[in-house]
Amino acid sequence: MFFVVIIALLLIIYEYYKYLSSKPSGTPPGVVGLPLIGIYWYCLWYDYKFPYRWFGYYSKKLKSKVISCYLGSFFTVIANDYASVKELLLKEEFDGRLSDAYFIKARAFNKKLGIFFTDGDEWREQRRFALRHMRDFGFGRRHEIFETKSMEELNILMDMLKNGPINENEKKYLYKYKEMHGENGEYGFVGSYLNKLKESNIPSSYTEEYLLLTLLDFILPATISTSSNITFAIKFMMHFPNVAKKVKEEIHKVVGSGRLPTWEDRNKLPYTEATIRETMRYETLTPLGVIRRCTKDTTFQGYFIPNNTTLIPNIAEINHDPDFWGDPKNFRPERFLKDDGQFNKDFSLPFGAGHRLCAGETFARFMMFEVFATLMQNFDFSFVEGQPTRIEDKFPGIITTPAETWIRLKPYS
């Protein structure tokens, strides 16, 4: 028995030594983890719900804006300041996605589908097709009909998705769409895609499964992130009544009460728009962006980055960096405005950058402005007695969402 224990200990020591020596040479300074689980035990100790805080902590401890570690078996590099995050997002070699993770495959029939978690030639082809045809119907640019119907369609889409990703609702919707779709019909993006499926000699990536995942990749971020941002904005208005007062005064001075605010009013309502931007900085919905993958050996910030390295842009860390923002803990929309009332450059990167820039940025900005400005024009908001009111209450995830918040609405007078 004693001999078996000694052998087991020697094997553990050997595996740990092999693990310690597996870190590629020339890569960023890192944190030593454990075999199989990597640095997860650090996260459990420091802040398992919001790992961006742990990354930021060790970035300071190691005195390096770029650090490395093992997340399970994945060698990972994390960028923690604006310069390194921006380079990571713009670097073509970092356009890959971590598509082999279990939870990513599980959502896509155990395949690489959609445009969110895929890369390479198939991703480029599918993204190009989606953007080209969706822009024909108003997505991603100014379009009067699109702007008129967007609010109604958003509610319908959210109702469709209430049971989560890839369920019978989406399949029934697609089958019904196919029945309605004529030979030359053009019923939006789905109709264009179904027409594409009828063509001969099309790339093998064009399938109904790919269409389903592409729809989800557009719809879920658009609905969840937009509604979460608006909820956070209203919650912040209750916590910061002086800001809410300035927003209301600006809207009623420019728009009045006889009509609703429109996108055309946006440049005339700089403080309102700045408040939305400050909301996205103060509460970063995607704290770690969307995880990237290095597609070939390269260098980054003076370090060697081997092929297949996992890459994380710590966007939440840069949005709370006192060296960059001065007073990041303060909710201060004025930071996005120049002295003459014009907009400063937005360094908060809420929609990413580079080839992977969020395709729905125009849609999201339009929806947030329209809904937030309309609500602020027409209602006063206050907390409900006895209900949680803490500003830090939220649910972690790829997209941070607000915790349940009870709000009392009273018509503005």
Language-model-detected regions and their locations in the chain:
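Cytochrome P450 heme-binding "Cys pocket" and the immediately downstream C-terminal segment
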Residues: 241-243, 344, 362-398
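Cytochrome P450 catalytic-domain helical core, especially the substrate-recognition surface
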Residues: 32-57, 75, 102-176, 187, ...
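N-terminal membrane-proximal hinge/A-helix region immediately C-terminal to the signal-anchor transmembrane segment
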Residues: 2-111, 121-125, 151-156, 291, ...
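Conserved cytochrome P450 K-helix E-x-x-R motif and the immediately C-terminal K′/meander segment
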Residues: 41-63, 260-302, 322
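Central I-helix of cytochrome P450 enzymes
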Residues: 172, 176, 199-252, 279, ...
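Conserved cytochrome P450 K-helix/beta-meander segment immediately N-terminal to the heme-binding cysteine loop
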Residues: 313-340
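Cytochrome P450
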Residues: 1-10, 70-77, 139-152, 161-172, ...
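Cytochrome P450 heme-thiolate "Cys pocket" and heme-binding signature region
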Residues: 301, 338-368, 393-395
